[in-house]
Amino acid sequence: KVYVNGVKLSNSGFWTFRFVRCDGVDISKVYVEGHANWNNDGFDIESRNVTITDCVVDTDDDAICFKSEDPDYVVENVTVKNCDLSSNCNFIKFGTASAGGFRNIRVSDCTLHKCSRSLLRFWEKRVPGVSDPITGIAGMALEVVDGGFMEDVVISDLTMEDVQTPLFIRLGRRKTSE
């Protein structure tokens, strides 16, 4: 089992935490600040039996992103609870890497709001109707575009502020010649 507790990480070179094919991850009381580049995700999860609790994530990119790049592997049995998530992109994202699938995932009791600063995106210059340079794009982005599946995903008791799209759902077929 992997335990990450009580650490603070700032401005990683890429995704701050990336868990791939782990069975048993317990993340608690972690502080992530990431504004160094476009891909400063907080947590990227492609594992099973994961718990993320009482964390603070302030990133320019996705705060928490669930990825499923292997068609023979399912991201499952994950709980995210009581987290304070700040983003200038997606707060909680499933996909777009979605070749396998997502099953039995719970997200609850989290606060989502715009990040503390932005050095990169400046949405008000790029998106019509957006007047604030710092704003979250999607509170929850549920994207299955690589042939995978999503089942038994429960999202409850989220508080969102300064989010352009509270819920974004995309089902598609990318990377295909059909």
State each model region's role.
Residues 1-178:
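Extracellular/periplasmic carbohydrate-active domains that bind, remodel
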